[in-house]
């Protein structure tokens, strides 16, 4: 295989505390990275880099791991601009919310949906995202949910079955019947196309008992749990996530002390989604409280047409630092290694020998600029699995 060295990196974020300055980011100054095929095979000081077939001079710019976006909803059609405009104008809007997207998604062709996913993922890639999870949840029939997962699987191997996004409009008068569908025929059709199962555990969606039944059924089919938890109100979602060893509890906006302690002591990652609070003018999650309790925190976009229509992880990093109590170091770790932890992956989110060669070259000397210069397109080059893709 051809080897490539990226040299003269001003600041390299490895996410290996044993390297560099000994912090969680494992920062190495004046660094180099060697790529062989799809893997990283060497990191260290630029002056000590081994000979390679190709050399790229970073010219004093920073390199960070590819961003890991562990929560998105990309298989959809249409948009919800009217809803957003009404919300930002302080006007009531009752035209359907998620149901609006469900109707548009059901009406779209496979080709239209796949093209939409490809477009949003290309948009994210240009901003440094090299790993992305995405969900179903805008079909809410057996056929449409399975179709969404098949389409998602063309673009990523981190696919989540979210038949339990809301109760389908077709079952508005029979929510128990819809839970039976989600845990029965829909699960049978969807399980072969997904790695994960998710549920929106919230007032107006699924209560704790329903969420438990859905996640337990999915686990019996080999799908690992994730959960939308405690976004709009206090509720049982976080405690259920920890109890069921869910990989991630997502949103985590309204937390009791017991919720925070459970996340601090368990293996479930608290995935924070600042784009949702930004887009809805809602209360910000308290990242500082979680971090101080010892919780593992991930940052993700929650890219979706209703409450967080952004594919930009750098934007979410800036929000987390400005409004959620995170330091720049904590935010970059959460958007890379934290996202990897939320997907229970050890091959991504870091720049160390053996990891997948996912790198982002910034047009800046330090990762801090991602928060320091919000809205500025700082991504200069992106490698995914050893291939330069931007």
From Swiss-Prot:
Give the matching Gene3D superfamilies: Metal-dependent hydrolases (3.20.20.140), Urease, subunit C, domain 1 (2.30.40.10)
The residues listed in the UniProt record as binding 4-imidazolone-5-propanoate, with positions renumbered to this chain, are 80, 138, 165, 231, 307
Residues that hold Zn(2+) according to the record: 71, 73, 228, 302
Identify the cofactor(s).
Zn(2+); Fe(3+)
Q: Which Pfam families match?
A: Amidohydro_1
Q: Which reaction does it catalyse?
A: 4-imidazolone-5-propanoate + H2O = N-formimidoyl-L-glutamate
* A single GO BP: L-histidine catabolic process to glutamate and formate
Q: Where in the cell is it found?
A: Cytoplasm
Q: Which family does it belong to?
A: Belongs to the metallo-dependent hydrolases superfamily. HutI family.
Biological role stated in the UniProt entry: Catalyzes the hydrolytic cleavage of the carbon-nitrogen bond in imidazolone-5-propanoate to yield N-formimidoyl-L-glutamate. It is the third step in the universal histidine degradation pathway.
Q: What is this protein called?
A: Imidazolonepropionase
Organism, by scientific name, is: Streptomyces griseus subsp. griseus (strain JCM 4626 / CBS 651.72 / NBRC 13350 / KCC S-0626 / ISP 5235)
What is the name of the gene encoding this protein? hutI
């Amino acid at each position: 295989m051809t080897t490539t060295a990226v040299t003269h990196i001003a600041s390299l974020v490895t996410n290996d505390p044993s390297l560099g300055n000994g912090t969680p980011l494992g920062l190495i100054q004046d660094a180099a990275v060697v790529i062989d095929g799809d893997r990283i095979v060497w990191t260290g000081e630029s002056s000590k880099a081994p000979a390679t077939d190709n050399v790229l001079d970073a010219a004093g710019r920073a390199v960070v791991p590819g961003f890991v976006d562990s929560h998105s909803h990309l298989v959809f059609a249409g948009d919800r601009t009217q809803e957003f405009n009404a919300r930002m104008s302080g006007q009531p809007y009752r035209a359907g919310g998620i149901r609006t997207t469900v109707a548009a998604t059901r009406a779209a062709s496979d080709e239209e949906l796949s093209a939409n996913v490809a477009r949003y993922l290309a948009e994210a890639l240009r901003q440094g995202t090299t790993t992305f999870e995405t969900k179903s949840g805008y079909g809410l029939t057996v056929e449409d949910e399975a179709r969404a997962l098949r389409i998602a699987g063309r673009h990523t191997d981190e696919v989540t079955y979210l038949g339990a996004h809301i109760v389908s409009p077709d079952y508005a008068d029979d929510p128990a019947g819809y839970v039976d569908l989600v845990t029965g025929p829909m699960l049978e059709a969807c399980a072969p196309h997904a790695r994960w199962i998710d549920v929106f555990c919230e007032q107006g969606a699924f209560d704790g008992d329903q969420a438990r039944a859905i996640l337990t059924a999915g686990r019996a089919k080999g799908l690992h749990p994730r959960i939308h938890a405690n976004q709009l109100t206090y509720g049982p979602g976080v405690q259920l996530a920890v109890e069921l060893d869910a990989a991630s509890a997502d949103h985590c906006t309204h937390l009791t002390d017991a919720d925070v302690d459970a996340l601090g002591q368990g293996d479930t990652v608290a995935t924070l989604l600042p784009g949702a609070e930004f887009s809805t003018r809602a209360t910000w999650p308290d990242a500082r409280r979680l971090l101080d309790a010892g919780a593992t925190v991930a940052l993700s976009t929650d890219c979706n047409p209703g409450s967080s229509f952004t594919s930009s992880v750098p934007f979410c990093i800036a929000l987390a630092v400005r409004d959620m109590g995170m330091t720049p170091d904590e935010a970059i770790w959460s958007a890379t290694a934290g996202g990897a932890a939320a997907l229970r992956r050890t091959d991504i989110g870091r720049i160390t020998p053996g990891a997948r060669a996912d790198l982002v070259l910034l047009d800046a000397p330090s990762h801090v600029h991602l928060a320091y210069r919000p809205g500025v397109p700082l991504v200069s080059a992106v490698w995914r699995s050893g291939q330069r893709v931007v």
